[in-house]
Amino acid sequence: MFRPNSLLIPSNLSTTKSQRNTMLNSSYLSFALIFFCCILFSALASSLPVSDPELVVEEVHRKINESISRRKLGFFSCGSGNPIDDCWRCDKDWEKNRKRLADCGIGFGKNAIGGRDGEIYVVTDPGNDDPVNPRPGTLRYAVIQDEPLWIIFKRDMTIQLKEELIMNSFKTLDGRGASVHISGGPCITIQYVTNIIIHGLHIHDCKQGGNTYVRDSPEHYGYRTVSDGDGVSIFGGSHVWVDHCSLSNCNDGLIDAIRGSTAITISNNYLTHHNKVMLLGHSDTYEQDKNMQVTIAFNHFGEGLVQRMPRCRHGYFHVVNNDYTHWEMYAIGGSANPTINSQGNRFLAPDDSSSKEVTKHEDAPEDEWRNWNWRSEGDLLLNGAFFTYSGAGPAKSSSYSKASSLAARPSSHVGEITIASGALSCKRGSHC
């Protein structure tokens, strides 16, 4: 497995996971004010349809600015300016209110409710993975059920799956309160299903599977060809939210979304030690991906990454307030005329003089890609990093947003709002 060397970065931009966890123990606000904020965020989200990409961009901007404003006024002493986290993390009774998380989404995947309307299912058995006849108590048994389920884990566990974990619709995987690792085998597949939330998991060292039978519902199992070995594979899925996961070192992609997938938010994740990080769009000729809409927000792209953060095709992609501290080839790339709206990110280029460019326009001559709409607005470009604009470029344009005044949070604050990226260490009875 290819493991690129980590690059050195200034100490004020790089933190260890233990340092980041220590920095999280700040002051906290009362439950009542946070609950009020969550209601407000939910009302704002419900007023804007996912079908309008520009309005969703506007909504992300507005939520970030509202969170900042309240903090400046003293309302959010525990707030980070991260509207997702500020919606639920200040509640020390988070374990009793787990499903509140479903009302905290932003961006294109904001309507993903997962298993909010179902029962809580507790995974008690990390082993005994039978891909065709899973036992009650196992993760596979939970995810294939037809009814909505909010799936939690009884204790710390490492789950090594024998084949892909093929999820059914309306499921939440909630790792809070335990250290849950899915690793060493095939990992998560979201295929032709909807309303999935994946939160708080360590997903790493995922392998290929296939050439065997796998169950995907209580009534059906089918023959699977060889899988790619992604950490999270979204194949024709919709209303998907991947939040606060730690992902690394998988066979193909860490998170890939293809074949008409849409309405996706990828947020607050910590991604490390991988080559082809994130593919969004199946192929240059698969035009159904023109409807793809993905929000990539508040993630930390960390040590040992090479490329595809993300690599986009056809659709509309909002890359906002992420921290890019490492890449070897490039950070954001694409082909087949995707619209890429990069706002308020922090890009720290590697020392290699040949890899300073953030972007890579792929598989097209310049006279073609110069018409693709890619812009950088408010990004912080460090150590010689540069972003190659194209199409409408950095100018205010309806090609990107209808409300350019509601900008993303300043890139100088990215370190603060991404400091808790990855799977959190949540203890029952304490603020998460």
UniProtKB/Swiss-Prot annotation:
Family the UniProt entry places it in: Belongs to the polysaccharide lyase 1 family.
E.C. designation(s): 4.2.2.2
Gene Ontology annotations for the cellular component aspect, listed alphabetically: plastid
Active site per the UniProt annotation: 308
Lineage: Eukaryota, Viridiplantae, Streptophyta, Embryophyta, Tracheophyta
Organism of provenance: Arabidopsis thaliana (Mouse-ear cress)
Catalytic activity entry: Eliminative cleavage of (1->4)-alpha-D-galacturonan to give oligosaccharides with 4-deoxy-alpha-D-galact-4-enuronosyl groups at their non-reducing ends
Protein's UniProt name: Probable pectate lyase 22
Pathway connected to this protein: Glycan metabolism; pectin degradation; 2-dehydro-3-deoxy-D-gluconate from pectin: step 2/5
Gene Ontology biological process: pectin catabolic process
Top-rank taxon, per record: Eukaryota
Glycosylation sites: 65
GO molecular function: metal ion binding; pectate lyase activity
Keyword terms: Calcium, Glycoprotein, Lyase, Metal-binding, Signal
Cofactor: Ca(2+)
Gene3D superfamilies: Single-stranded right-handed beta-helix, Pectin lyase-like (2.160.20.10)
Annotated cofactor note: Binds 1 Ca(2+) ion. Required for its activity.
